[in-house]
Structure formats: C-alpha cells, structure tokens
UniProtKB/Swiss-Prot annotation:
InterPro entries: A-crystallin/Hsp20_dom, HSP20-like_chaperone, HspG1-11-like
Entry annotated with the keyword Coiled coil: no
Matching PANTHER family: HEAT SHOCK PROTEIN DDB_G0288861-RELATED (PTHR46827:SF1)
Gene3D superfamilies (alphabetical): 2.60.40.790
Domain named sHSP: residues: 31-74
Name assigned to this protein: Small heat shock protein hspG10
Gene: hspG10
PROSITE patterns the record matches: SHSP
Family according to the record: Belongs to the small heat shock protein (HSP20) family.
Lineage of the organism: Eukaryota, Amoebozoa, Evosea, Eumycetozoa, Dictyostelia
Keywords assigned: Stress response
C-alpha cells in the first residue's frame, strides 16, 4: 500500500492524477485512498511534518489519528 508520502511525491513529481490513483490499494467500499483524501496543506521542517486539513461536518471528538507501518490514517 502506498504511504501518504508516496502519493504526494508521485502527484507532485509528474502531476499525473490517474497514475497516483493506480498506486493506491482499494478499501472495502472499493474507493481508493485518493478518492477519500481531503485537500490538505503539508509543510516539512527539519524535525516535523505538519499536515493541515479541513474536515467539514466532523466533530473534533469524532476524529481519530493513527500511524501504523508508515501509514497515517485520520
């Protein structure tokens, strides 16, 4: 499965959205990761990666964040 870094790197380097979608595996609802990926701002500093995204209509209490095997899940 592609990581968020792979997705961003592919999308930024060759700007080929379809190629990026093909790299992502599908989930149980047959949507690829990119189909459910909200727009986000990604900033990298020397010691951290900052990801900002809007999750309209979702309460802060209902947001879960998990990192496992280099995969960030929000």
């Amino acid at each position: 499965m592609a990581t968020i870094f792979d997705i961003l790197n592919t999308h930024n380097n060759n700007n080929n959205f379809e190629n990026c979608k093909r790299q992502c595996s599908t989930n149980k609802s047959n949507k690829t990761i990119i189909d459910i990926l909200p727009s986000m701002d990604v900033t990298m500093t020397n010691d951290k990666l900052i990801i900002e995204t809007e999750l309209a209509g979702i309460s802060k209490d209902h947001i879960e964040i998990d990192i496992k095997d280099s995969i960030l899940t929000i």
